[in-house]
Amino acid sequence: GSMPWWLYSTDYAWTQAPFMITDRETYMNVYDSDVIRQVRQSWADEYHVKDLCGGFYRGMRKVVATKKLESVEDLSGLKLRMNSSALWNSAWQALGAVTVPLSLNELYTSIQTGVVEGCENPLSESGYLNVPEVVDYVINTDHVVEVAIICMNNDLFESLPAPYQEALLKAGQEAIAWGEEQGEAEEEQWLKAY
């Protein structure tokens, strides 16, 4: 399956710090660095996880809100749905937002009832939750590059004959190409929904 890799390598969560890495190319250069290669090796050693294809782009995280935001000052007092990441909460609080930890399944009604005035997600995630029905504005903050990996149990991978391993690695690369194409198309599609 796919996963946000940094959840399992919390020492490297800085790669997901808001505004730290704000474009896809830089993120992929970091992900392909020796430092992160060591992390991927630690997954195999500690968790028995095999990264089949490297990171694939899921889109840029953006803020969507019920009101137009034109400057950082406009974040002051904005009630923003946030996940439980202490790093993300503190970053948005430092910018003036009031962060409200909510699960995604509560997002729509929380915006509808005024519990929150917006959220930050990849547009596809907000879109599939029907958020465009209750907010009008997309703020192109592009504050986090959203990337996931496709992985499997490393012991199982190692037990397979070499041709099967090669087929899985090839399929992983094909899945990345397809997933990135879909991710870019979805980002454009959902941008039009607001």
Where are the regions that the model predicts?
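N-terminal secretory/targeting leader peptides
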Residues: 1-27, 35-194
